[in-house]
Every structure is written in structure tokens, then in C-alpha cells.
């Protein structure tokens, strides 16, 4: 019985795959053999040199062959499987079911090679293909190569900044990214695009693929696809041109199968070969591509990303490749698609692309930074770019001769691609033929001039003209049109180039939305649980609200709170992390972005409804609202409509903004509008005319009206204790002498009709209810439609490629613009070419002084096991080895072999069951181990606002001992900058990808951050050359070699080393899948020791021209589809080398265990290199500097506070002295408090990036104490909040026109602009450090804020709270902030009631109003507006503002008591923040959400079975 299994660890490349027999060996299936043969591989290759060479020659010949010209050798390779395909094909109607093939089956070779193309041709199904011509193509972008980064200082000097911006914009210049590029790729050809990072390779691919929106200066020249102009191609046939970017962006919580199935489903043609069903087509296409790229074992594993555990980095890259291929483009542009792949898998990728071009006639442009000779030989043509200029285009076998005639000679054992790329490196090694020293071109301009004057260039232009004459453009269009119509769904629009209809796209996106929700359970569970908890608490707060007039305000408060809670929850929808994925799928033409916008809305709706239903049922019946079915379902209906409308509104805002800071600012203003203009806080009659219109454009106003109408229509509210006058002495008076002191009352009537109350207080009419329903539908559909429209038309921000942004005052121009034509010309390139490579020799020697380490790191029988699928899975299997000072050890293996897992385990970064010994000098590692070792991760994660130099200086200060002089640390940093050749951009900000350092520069910074720490034990490097070109990789390895020679111990994983690069290493640790050792020992001169071991143990002989690194990976069966019969792990266990290694490990342990060692860190090991105070100083400086330069964040915060202050001030402008004015003053203070919600969202969005950096990299190196991350985040926010809250104070306080005395104003400022800011900064961070991610933090924050708001005494007076909950009123800090702010505003303020606020009644005959009510007034307060009248007495409930304060349980006398309580709350927030982070992130306590989804999982499984 066969089984397949897999496991992956976040950030690692560990996986298990394969089909296991009862003896544990890999059983090769015909599917494996088929895929291997199609990729040009065979297990017969192991028989010797001839087979290997023959295999390569077959591939080389097939490179230029058509489908009908496949060689007999290729056919012979598959002849042994002769019968099975016919059986399986006949069963499935021509569709090959790879999952059902078994090894004993045989199939017909001709059918498998020609089945798809031949059957399609026989059935009249057209397959599209087209060549590409580029003529004199140039691309220009904004000249941002040396920009200065803006800071908050620019805001402080705003007038000058505005003037400078206008000046720069008027005189803005463009820079040339691509200059006069030409090329020709016929259908079925592969073109390799070579160049260093920044040379324009990615830009050329984007231009070729029609992705030209980002080029601000536009694209010139002619690009045609078999004669079809690019503009027409993009309009009519966009799906056929695919650009696959370098970054692997996927929905991290989807599994591999879900990811591939979705892409295939979006591209499933309507007319399919042999009329197979849609489900069969999806399954077979997925299985085929997953088999080719070795992904079948990962079907049920999440794709993951840098922060979500999933498949390994190499497997994620393969998912990206497979996803692009299933989109069925005819022209592909692959941007560095082999990044992160091991050498064997990279070669298999190239061969797979070769097969698709041969059999399907597709055209491929590919950039590869480190291409082996085998990969190079799979291509037809190659072009070389040098800083945007083309210096060669032609056949691959003529490129080397072209540059040889130019005067350059390829050094021995240097692969062709490396030779070609090296020519464009001014610092690289160039072997010049004798006599050509002064003739060869050296600068980009000279190379370009030589190329354009060459016969090869003239022949290229002739070939392009000839090709354009040969092709029949109209016939190509006809075939394209017919093919697309065959593929297109019958319900799709006629002019649409999408395969499936818009409604099918929505269905697929909805299904994917459900899968994403199920994959990311934490957020959904937190949302539903928050709703249930909040409803229980709030429902009990309003428990059995009185049905009399005393409960009317509370009933409105319950309904308002329901609306406000779900409005706050809408802020959690401001997500930007998925935007790159939507952009990629738009490029692939999988679906309309609008379909995703609608699909995600539909998918989220049921889960929101679950939470909302639970929420409303609980709060509705606990609070004692109208218990009739009609009222309940009307409230339910309008709450649902409003919630969905507000969610759609916030999603609309996110869709229209470029970043989350902008979205948070705008959403904060919208949130204030929702809170203010619902008509609960300020009613329509009291609204100022300049803002009244806002209430009419928000759905909450109509929802609130209809919900109030459902509650109060027809309700008779008894007066209860609100009769005036009443009490002692008024027991026996007639009813006509009393009145309800409530809006809507009538003289002599002891109750108030709910409809009268709503009409007078709110101007609400029952006839509006269903009108409002129609209006809300318009809002909901309008917001959704606008969101879909903006999502559809939103384009990426225009720019000019990678742009360096320098720290203000330090920028350096390395390029100059020609004033006349704007072209770029490099300065002093010749001088740099000839002299610069030797200028850093001295500094390189200086860096290695006193570097020698005496520590030997040993690991013995290391095993690593983790829980998996209800059991345990072993990822490392008794791995042993050692690293000695002065040695450079390579750690190799295919993707999923356990390289990163081993590094993480040895570096003490894994959590799980770890057994075995890890020793330093024979002794167990101590607490200083992490900081005494360096670890360069695969992910290049840095603080974007710091410069390169500042990042290195911070690492040096934190990682080196405090007793090392500051000058020495900084000198060492400067040496590292020189050695890594980072001087030109040392003062450049790290920035983000595309606007900051490029991939190469980021990788160098990652290495530099560890080198400046001067680790005295060991340096771990995980793929340090990934994403770099061959020259940069060589420079990095040479640096490591020098470090090793100086005494450093280095263990380094490496994926695609060239032969020369590989032989720079001293020792090799080779792993196979399962974390099993295959070899550990010396490599030897020219790899002789290593090759001898493999050849002696059954591997074929390695030819002299082969790359040993590729040879050994092939020998052990590495690769996505490869397999071998030998068990190389068992061979290693039985070898003499293994016995020798074990003996040496034991000898080292015995020898070193009794020796005493010394280090820079002193005798007593410590976890951190520096003191807490020293760490605090520099972490605070770094955090403050980062915030100072984050202008988007600061401006968003300033806009929120400034606009918010003006908004509140002029909404409640001069509220007056009436009773309504008192309420509006209370709400003005209350809404000022609510403004903290979006402000805290802003804080959390920024702080999460610092948390992720610390947890992924800095904490693992014990760089500084974890508490400093929290404290410095808190402290760095304070100055900006103080400043912006001062602006808020001025713009909101004085328009209220209450107290202008300096004393009152100053105390108000102290309460809000100082104390409240200190409070909510800490509160927002406290919630963030509790949550697993930002979205969950937003939900938890909304829950907590709703608690604080509900219990502060505004929406529910404390007098009406159940006795149990009065402690929460006393506990809520918002209670005391509101008390003080309202107390200052209303203290000693006289009250003059308006006419409608007066309670009118008649006194008994013969008495004046004053005489009749005197006893009542003495006890209850208030005043009679007409004391001497004998009829129509006018009673006002309050005489001064302090009476109102007493009613809401506040008092001016509480002022300084509350001030003391503020400090207690602020201190509690800080302590809670530290404690929560310790519990959830240091101790690692986490919650499991799977059980909550158990029922949903069962339903899903049943659904699958039924299908």
C-alpha cells in the first residue's frame, strides 16, 4: 500500500514526499518516469558518461524541433511503458489520470507525446502561439535614482516644502530604464535575458509582457506579437501574454491544491479535448503540473509566506511556476523564476519550459541570475543588458564567440552565462585577450555602440524584417479569435478576453473566499466570539430596560450601540496584504478584480451573519426590547443592512487608497461621521446647516431611524418618576396639574406615545421605515459597485524601477542627466573599471584582524520532531557534524531536504522535540550562544526607514560587548561597508521593494548586519546568494572564504553554486529528503574527494566539464521528479567516511571538554552583549528615527487629529445653554474619546512591522531585551500625539464656546491632550501584543473599546445599569475622562431650556407656578421659566450645568481625583503590555481554533463526498 506524506516548517525547506514501499524506499511510478522523460531525464543516466551526454544532446536537439521532429531516442525512452496510457486514456476519454497510474501498467509512447496536440487538432481545437518582435524599444521612468527621503521636518517647514514640491514637479526629469532594445523570438523559442540586478532585465520582461503602467515616462518603440501591435494584443488577447514576477505572492492560508485548482478553474476551456468533464480537466491538469514540479505531496499544506507556516521557499517558488503555467499563455516572461530553487530543480524547471515551447509552440523570455551550463543550453537565444542598454542578442552558441572577437576570453570552468554577466560588472574579473587591452569596450555606452555597429546587430534587424514579412497577421488573429471563442464560456461577454463568465468568476472567488476563511480560523473565531461576549455584557448592562420614559434614552442607546459596534468592526476590513496577489491574477487574466471584490464580500457574509445573529439575539432579549416578532426581525433586517453597508464603505476606502495609513486616516473621519450623524448624539433639529447634509449620505442614519421606529411605534411609555410635580405634598393633586417631564408629553397625560417622542425629538415618521429600506439597498449596492469599479480600474503606482532614496542631506549622485536629451550617462566608469577593484584590498585585510575564533561547534545525532496530523513527524534524522575555525562548510540538498531546519535547530531557533548533542568546545551551549553566532536568514527583513549604515551601526552596538570602544565598533562597520561594496548606497534608506534597495543590496545588508556583530563562534548563512547574480554570489563567497581563512567558522546553505563557486568551500554536508545525511566530509581539490566517494559507491563517473554540485544532486535523486534506486543514506551509514566522521566527533568532544576557552564576552556568559540602559538608549533612538522618517504615517495621524478636531468643533459649534446643548456638549466630549479608535488602528498598523522584525530576526540573535521593543514603541509615539492633540484641542475646544478662561482651557488640554494620549497609546499597543495578527488586533480592539464606551455612563446612565455592572462603570477609564472633560465644559453654566424642552402644566386655581412647584423644586431641582404665571407653567429640568453633571454621576469636584486615577490606568497599560507580550510571545502561549470549526469541516467533507 502506498502512502504520500508531507510536512513543512515556517521559513524552512523541509518536506517529505514520495511513494514509500514497505521497505521504506522510493517506488517510482510511471507518472514519475513519464515526467522525468518529458523533462529530459532518465534513471539510465546513472549508467555512465555516455548516457548523460546523450541525454543533454537529445534535449539540445529537441530545443529547436517541432512536435513532429522528436528524436527516436526520446521515443525509445518511453517505449517500455507501452500500454497503460491507452487504457487510462480510454477510461477517461483522453485525459491522463496520473493519480491512477501504477508501475505495472504500460502505455503507448506515441499517444502520450502527441495526444494533446493531435487530439486537439483532430477535434478542431485551436492551440494559440505567436512569436515576438521588439524594435528599438525604450522605457523611461521618473528619475528617482537619488531622491532624498522626506521626514517630519518637511512638515514643520511646510511652506518651503510646498514650494520645493511645485518647483521639482514642474522641472521633473525622466530616466531611461531601457534604451534601444531589439529582439526576435519565434514561436517555440526560449530567450535568456542576462544582466546584473538593476540592468533592466525585469523591465524588459515587463515591457515585453505589456505591463507598462509603472513606467511614468512611457514606452517607445515597436513591440509586436506575430504582427499584432502590443496595444491591440493587450486589448484583445491579454491572457496569452503572462508576466511571472520574482516575488512569490499567494494567499498564505490556502493549500497548494486550492491555489492550483483555482487558477485552473479560471482557465478551464468550454471546449475540452475528448469532452472530458470540467472536474476531470481540473484534476488532471493539476496532477500533471504538480507531478512535473514535485508538488503532489504538498497538496494539503498551506502555501504560507514569511510569517505563516507553509511549504518551503523552494516549493513556494514551484507553486508560483505551476500556477503561471496552468494559465495557458502562449508568451511567457519569467522573472528570475529559479530563485530559491536548488540546482537540480532549477534545471528541471528550464527543461519543463523547454518541453512546453517544443510541444505547444509557446514563447518564453526568462531572466536567470545564476544559470548553469545545462540550463543555458536549453535556450535558443540570449540577450545581455548593461544598465538598461542592450549589448548582445542572438543564438546562445554564438554569444561567447561574439565577445571573444570583441577581445574578451572566457576563463576556464566559467559557465557561459556567468561569463556574459561578468562583462557588465565594472568590479568583476575580465580576461582580456592579448593585444586587446586598449580596444575592448568597458562602459555600457561603448558596449552598446560596439553592438549596434556589429554585423550581428544588422543581421538581427534583417531577421526581424524578414520574420514580419513571413507571418500572416490576419491568420494569427483568426486563429486567436477562434481559439478564444472555443475556450470562452457561453455566458461570457463576446468581447471579454476572460475564459469564464463574470458570474462564474464570482462563484470561484466566493469559493476561494470560504477556503481562505477556513484556512485562517483565528480571525473568524475571534470575530464571532467577540460578538457573543460583547452582546452578553452589553445585554446585561441594559438588562430589562424600563418600558417607561426613563428607559427611552436607553432603548435608543441599545440600538445605537448595536450599530456602532458593527461600524467599529468594519475598521478591521482595512487590509492591504492581498493587493499584490490581486495584481498578479489581473496580469494572468484569471478574473476581473471586481469579481474578487464581490466574491470576498459574499464569502464573508455568512460568517458575519453568524456573529451578528448571536449578537442581536442575546442583546435584544436581555435588554428587554420590544418582544414581538415583527419588531425583532425589522431590527435584525436593518442592522444587517447597515452592517454590510458600513463594511462595504470601509472596503471601498481601502480599495481607493495606496497604503494603510491613508486608509486609516480617512476611515477615522468616516467613523466620526458615523458616530455623530446617526442622529443619536445630535438630532436633526440641532444639526448645523453646514454639516447637516452628512447625515443624509450615511446609511446609519436611515438604519437608526427604522430601528427606532420598530421599537417605539405604538409604544405607550408611562411617566414613572418623571411626573412634574410629584413626590411628598403632591400625592392628591389632579392629573391635569401634572405632566411628564419628557419630550412628546401632553398636559394631563401620564404616558407618552412613542411616535410623538420620535417626531419631536428626532423628526422621525413611521411612514419613513420602508422608504429607508430602499435607500439602504441603494447605499449597499452603490458601495459594493464602487468598490468593484475602483478595484477593477486601480493601477499600480507609477515609478521608474528600483530607486535609491537617501537620508536627507547625504544623497550622492552617481549618475548625471544630460540636460538636452535626458539620457543617463555613468560617471567615471572607466576609472572605476580599472582601479576600483583593487582599492579595497587594504580594508579587506584590516577587517580580518583579530578575528580568529577558538570555538569548535559540534553536533551529534541531532533529531528534530514536531507534531503533525495527530502524530509526530521527524524532520532531522541523527545528523552529525562539526565546524572548525578557519573552515567554510556548505550545507546542500534539494528543496525540502531539511537544510533550513538544520540551521534553525543548530542556531536554537526551532521549537519542537530536539534530541542529540550541540556542543561548543565539547561543552553544552550556554545562554550567550545566540548572540555569539551570526545567522543570515533567507528573508531580507529590515526597518525600511533606516539607512544601510544606521542598520549596520545598530547591529554592531547591540551585538558586540559594551566594553568594546564605540570608535572600534564604528570603524568595523565602515570596513564591512567597503568590503561588501556598499559605499555608494551606505546612506540610502532601506525602503521597500521597488522604492529603496534592490534585491542584491538587501541581501548584502542582511549579511553585513551579521558580520558587523563579529560573531566569535559561528556564522550561519541560509541561502546568502539567493536572488543574486553570479558576480555578486562570487563576491559573497569570496568574502566568506576570507572570513574562514581569518579563523571564522562558517556553515552555509547554498542552492545553485557554479563549479568554481562550489569548490571554494572546504567541507560539505549533504542531506536528502527526510533530513538524512548523505555525505559529510572534505570536498577536496577540484572536488576530487567528494566525487571519488560517489563514484566508488555506485554513481556514474562525473565528466570533467560537469558541475560537481549538480552531479551529486542528480546522483542522490534530488529534484522535483527524480528518483534513484540506491539508498544513499544507508550507503553513507555503511561507509568508512561515516565511521571516520563519528570518530573525529568523539575525539573532538573528548579533547575539548576539559579545555578552558576565552572570548570577548568575558568569563561569565550573558544573554545580551550590552546593559539594559545601553540597549534602551539605542533602541529608542532607532525607533524614534524610524518614526521621524515615516512621513505617510505622521501625515495620516496629523490629518486625523486636525480634521477630526475641526469636524467635532463645528458639528457642535456653540451648542448653547439649552438642555439639548448640555447633551451635545456631553457628546462632543464623548466623540473626542471615540476618535482614539482609528488613532489606535494607526498605531497598531505601524507597530506590527517592528514586532515582526523583532520576532523573526532580532530576538533570535538576543540583540536586545524584548521589553524594549514595547517601551520604545510607546515612548516614540508620545511627542507626535502631544503635538497633534494640541491641534485637535484648539480646533475642537474653542468652537464649543463654553469657557475661555485660561485655567479651564489648560485643565481641559491637560486631560485630553496629555493624559488621554498617554493612556490610549499604551492601550492600543497592549491589544496588539495580545493578538496573533493585525486584523485580529483590530477586532479585539473594537471589542475592548465597545466595553469601555458602553460602561462610561454616556450611552447608558449609571442609574439605569444593573447593580452588578456598576463596578464596570467605576472600572472603565473612559468614565473618568468623560467626567473631567464634561465637568470642565459645564461647570457653573446656566441652563435656559428651549420651548420644546419645557414641561407645561397648569397649577391649581389660585396659585402661581412658583408657589405650586416650590416644594418640588427644592427637592428635585430645575426652575420655572414663568414663576408668576397662573396657567401653563413652564418647567425646565436643570438650572445649571452642575445639575446635569449630577444626573450623569459626574462632578467638577472629581477633577483632581480622576487625574490621579489616570496615572494608575496609564501604569496598568504599560505593565499589562509587558505582561501580555511575555505570556503570548516570550513564553509562547497560544490558542487553538480548530475545534470551533469542527462542524464546518464536517459539512465541507460531506459536500466533497457528495460531489
Swiss-Prot record:
One cellular component term (GO) for this entry is: plasma membrane
Q: Which NCBIfam families match?
A: 3a01205
Q: Where is the ABC transporter domain?
A: 157-412, 857-1099
What phenotype is described for loss of this gene?
Leads to increased susceptibility to fluconazole. Also leads to increased susceptibility to 4-nitroquinoline-N-oxide (4-NQO).
- Sequence similarity: Belongs to the ABC transporter superfamily. ABCG family. PDR (TC 3.A.1.205) subfamily.
Q: Name one GO biological process term.
A: sterol homeostasis
Q: Is the keyword Mitochondrion in the record?
A: no
**An example molecular function term from Gene Ontology annotations:** ATP hydrolysis activity
- Tell me which residues bind ATP: 893-900
In terms of superkingdom, the source organism counts as: Eukaryota
Gene induction:
Expression is increased in clinical azole-resistant isolates, displaying amounts of transcript increasing from 3.3- to 44.3-fold. Expression is controlled by the pleiotropic drug resistance transcription factor PDR1. Expression is increased during biofilm growth. The expression levels are significantly down-regulated after exposure to the combination of fluconazole and tacrolimus (FK506).
Which InterPro entries does the entry link to?
A: AAA+_ATPase, ABC2_TM, ABC_trans_N, ABC_transporter-like_ATP-bd, ABC_transporter-like_CS, ABCG_dom, ABCG_PDR_1, ABCG_PDR_2
- What is the official name of this protein in its record? ABC multidrug transporter SNQ2
Q: Which SUPFAM superfamilies match?
A: P-loop containing nucleoside triphosphate hydrolases
